């Protein structure tokens, strides 16, 4: 049986990753760049990169195609655009970028370190109403809080 990080690692052989400072440069130099945020809507509403498109990981593949309830026309038309996929920590985005490549997206990358790294690089985030998010609030939000029942039981 594979574990989550093994699956991510295997996809990395085919997926290009960029660092937060690279995304900052790409956003400044390519106004056509599409940032896809594959986190859940409640995560996106809390904070995201301004102008990014929320396409939750669970509907990504159907959102990339015509004739589905989840179809997102901007995403379907983006197969030849530069696309950067983001998530919280850079793992879900690798899986999503891999799927998008299989679906014919030619210039897709994953944000290594995810929005945590974006925040650590002190780049701006906005909330669901597009208001600036305080970086201290973002720091608190991105601090992992595992419940006891989420921890691996002792052997």
Task: Set out the residue ranges of the language-model regions.
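Rhodanese-like catalytic fold shared by cysteine-dependent sulfurtransferases
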Residues: 1-33, 41-82, 91-155
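Short, surface-exposed ligand- or partner-binding patches at beta-edge/loop junctions that are enriched
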Residues: 86
């Amino acid at each position: 049986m594979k574990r989550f990080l093994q699956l991510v690692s295997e996809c990395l052989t085919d997926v290009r990753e960029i660092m937060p400072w690279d995304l900052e440069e790409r956003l400044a130099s390519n106004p056509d760049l599409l940032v896809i945020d594959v986190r859940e809507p409640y995560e996106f509403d809390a904070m995201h990169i301004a102008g990014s498109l929320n396409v939750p990981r669970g509907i990504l593949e159907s959102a990339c195609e015509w004739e589905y309830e989840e179809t997102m026309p901007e995403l379907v038309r983006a197969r030849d655009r530069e696309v950067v996929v983001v998530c919280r920590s850079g793992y879900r985005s690798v899986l999503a970028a891999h799927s998008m490549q299989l679906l014919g997206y030619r210039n897709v990358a994953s944000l290594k370190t995810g929005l945590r790294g974006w925040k650590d690089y002190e780049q701006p985030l906005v909330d669901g109403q597009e208001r600036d998010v305080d970086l201290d609030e973002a720091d608190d939000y991105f601090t992992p809080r595992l419940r006891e029942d989420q921890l691996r039981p002792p052997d």
